[in-house]
């Protein structure tokens, strides 16, 4: 689930297949494509995939029981595998494009460990954000402004509106409350 969001994919899917010794290598019984919406995050996409997985099994179980289901051999040369993600993979590099940081944040939001950066040598989690086309206002990681919508930070290309943030060990708050609570000023750098 995480990798398709990190990579900015627009579609994923679920596959019902036979179990064999190698992971995900068994004959395919059925598969379904699932569109990935711009606002989807890891949790919402997981729930979509869960729903489709139940539906695909419900539809195919009678055929499986009767031995009348499809058995399409997989072309393993076309398979792609991505390794597991580790919490440190959630570290934000502000030099990246705003859309890449957005994709990372939505890929590792709750219930996963979260995208994070540092401010004043303290870990800050970014739970919800939004890419904006505002560009060239400052160096990557620089706090450009904040208002009721959140905190606007410069990225390598474009900017990112931080909507829900959390200083490690503290409660989650909206970006504006975060800026107020920690007396942030324009020009501060997130690293």
Model segments located where?
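Short, flexible active-site loop motifs that bind/organize anionic cofactors or intermediates
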Residues: 35, 91, 168
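Active-site-lining helix/loop region of Rossmann-like oxidoreductase modules
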Residues: 59-118, 125
């Amino acid at each position: 689930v995480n990798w398709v969001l990190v990579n900015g994919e627009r579609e994923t899917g679920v596959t019902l297949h036979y179990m064999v010794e190698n992971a995900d290598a068994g004959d395919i019984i059925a598969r379904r494509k699932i569109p990935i919406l711009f606002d989807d995050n890891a949790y919402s996409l997981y729930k979509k995939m869960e729903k489709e997985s139940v539906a695909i099994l419900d539809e195919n179980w009678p055929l499986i029981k009767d031995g009348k289901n499809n058995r399409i051999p997989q072309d393993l040369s076309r398979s792609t595998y991505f390794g597991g993600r580790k919490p440190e993979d959630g570290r934000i590099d502000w030099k990246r494009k705003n859309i890449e940081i957005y994709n990372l944040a939505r890929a590792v939001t709750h219930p996963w460990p979260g995208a994070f950066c540092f401010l004043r040598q303290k870990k800050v989690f970014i739970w919800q954000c939004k890419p904006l086309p505002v560009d060239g206002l400052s160096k990557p990681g620089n706090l450009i402004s904040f208002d009721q919508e959140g905190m606007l930070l410069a990225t390598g290309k474009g900017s990112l509106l931080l909507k829900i943030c959390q200083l490690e060990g503290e409660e989650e708050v909206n970006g504006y409350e975060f800026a107020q609570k920690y007396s942030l000023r324009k020009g501060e750098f997130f690293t």
